[in-house]
Amino acid sequence: MKNSVLILALSLLTWLSSCSSAVDAGKINIENWKSDRYGCKGLRLQDAEEFRTIKNQFLGIDNQALIKTFGRPDRVELVDKSQSFFFYFLEPSSDCAGVELKKEPLRVLFRMNALSKVSEVTVTDQNP
């Protein structure tokens, strides 16, 4: 009986420690980031320079930690079975009401590998 309680407690502890948690995003205002879906309000653009300086610290984190940190991505693109992209728009995208695009909006691209880990972080106005 004591062994089964000990095994259950250790299993629970292992399971809880394996869950992803949010990543430190430096001076980026995460509340503004999460409330600015598709970059419509322009709040994410205020943190673009800060993001550029810390973007490499997100390499290797899993997709769940990314979602817990920045919220649900504005767009997800599955390239093939081995990689996908998470898009977070810094400038208003075509999904914003009343926005007429003259150029592609600035966005953050997180490239996810087959293990759902971030393998590349890019700030660009180009599609992958």
Language-model features and meaning:
Residues 15-18:
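C-terminal motif of bacterial Sec signal peptides marking the signal peptidase cleavage site
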